[in-house]
Amino acid sequence: MSFNDQQCKQPCVPPPCLQKTQEKCQAQAEDVCVSSCQDPCQDKCPQQAQEVCVSQCQELSQGNCPQQGQDPCLPPSQDQCLPQCAEPCQELAQTKCVEEFPQKVQEKCSSQSKGK
């Protein structure tokens, strides 16, 4: 009955604050994963990007959501973005980091010579 994770993760049009956050998360994760990693072929790369993703997400979603006020994902009675609402953003970001960026990493690895 109370606002819970499942309600938060219900399919709906992501509010602008989460969309913006997601984009920034992806860009940030890409930077970390592709450029900051010493060896892009290492498994640590997506992990590192994931950490950045999540921390960026928390900051950005907390900063943006309260300004947005009416989020389509929230019940009408809620006019502020609850902490749980940052979770979909984090999950999306993590998924992007783990699924998308390893692909870019693999491209980078194969375009360079395979070290190991």
Curated annotation (Swiss-Prot):
Domain of life, source organism: Eukaryota
InterPro entries reported in the protein's UniProt record: PRR9
Protein name (Swiss-Prot/TrEMBL): Proline-rich protein 9
This protein's encoding gene: Prr9
